[in-house]
């Protein structure tokens, strides 16, 4: 290792050339962007703590657990001097997102349709670290760390400080040329490498498309997201029941959500990745929602082997599927919910019952009544009862509306028979006849 490089407070041309050599190596390993920043105190830590204090993290308790460590990268590696921030573009033409406006098909976030990025990037980072060690750019293996999304680091700040781009109003980082379809990762080393300049000069301006497009209003303020409302959190991180006020907002998203990125103008010209790792797996593009409900555990494990989708487990994915079926207009949707209502998982049955109650088909009422007789789990029974109560309430409203419509129709018909002046027309005619007789 170059000891002078590690200890020097200033950098010379040779140091800059070394940085560019490292950057070139990172790009050759499959990263689409490589940047450098110092392992100093983080600038956004107080904002991060305030976000946690607001409860915006929902049930992601692991974020609170490591919050104190995130004040500085040196809390995870005391000897760290430099953070090498890297990013991979995962945007592919065949990703089933915007093409899947068809409500009968389940939609997955772009990042999840290929191989699990945690595994892919971790292998590339290890290769990068081995090269850095071979070049003497770290004192030893123990003086390095590699992280992909899971470490106690403020990844977006590190990437911003390393010159990546700016914080979009949806809170994702936006690169001026690559857009926001990128995955971040880091290598920490104990050598001082000249840092890149933090990004500046461009931001979102007056654009609010992501804020307006979010179906649940999860973007509560500029660059701040309430995860408890976010469809990605609700379909992935939340392990149990989805709050009722958000269920109908899922549309046909069954793993994650990309709406805020899809509407972003900076992603219109985002380059497409040539890396086949991120291509959609077979079976994701054409499978209908009601076919996903038939997914058994063995098939789930095979379909999503080394995939980020495994995070939800089968029960979580099927919970999302039956919830999405509530808004599917295809006749087969009902058959899918019937299967969901008989699933072994309480969570799936519970959301199937809600979805049947949400659908305005008369047959769903009798289906719920029949299942109520055989259901043994209290939470599912309560869900069925609430679904039936909702249907009764809707039925009463419908009957009242029909009665009101009938009354209006009768009134209009009566007015039509009596003429434009109604009953007064009949009385005035009688008065005219009486006057003629008197004359």
Predicted regions span which residues?
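Auxiliary alpha/beta "docking" domains used to position bulky ligands
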Residues: 1-203, 251, 370-378
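Iron-sulfur cluster-binding cysteine motifs and their immediate structural context
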Residues: 28-31, 209-233, 239, 253-277, ...
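Short, charged low-complexity linear segments at domain edges
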Residues: 174-199, 227-246, 297-301
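C-terminal amphipathic alpha-helical segment
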Residues: 246-278, 299-310, 316-323
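Amphipathic alpha-helical scaffolding segments comprising HEAT/armadillo-like alpha-solenoid repeats
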Residues: 299-303, 330-341, 361-373, 395-400, ...
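Short inter-helical turns and helix N-cap capping residues of alpha-solenoid HEAT/ARM repeat scaffolds
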Residues: 314, 344-345, 376-377
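Structural detector for internal amphipathic alpha-helices that build alpha-solenoid repeat scaffolds
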Residues: 318-329, 339, 349-361, 381-394
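Short, intrinsically disordered C-terminal tails of secreted or membrane-associated proteins
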Residues: 434-435
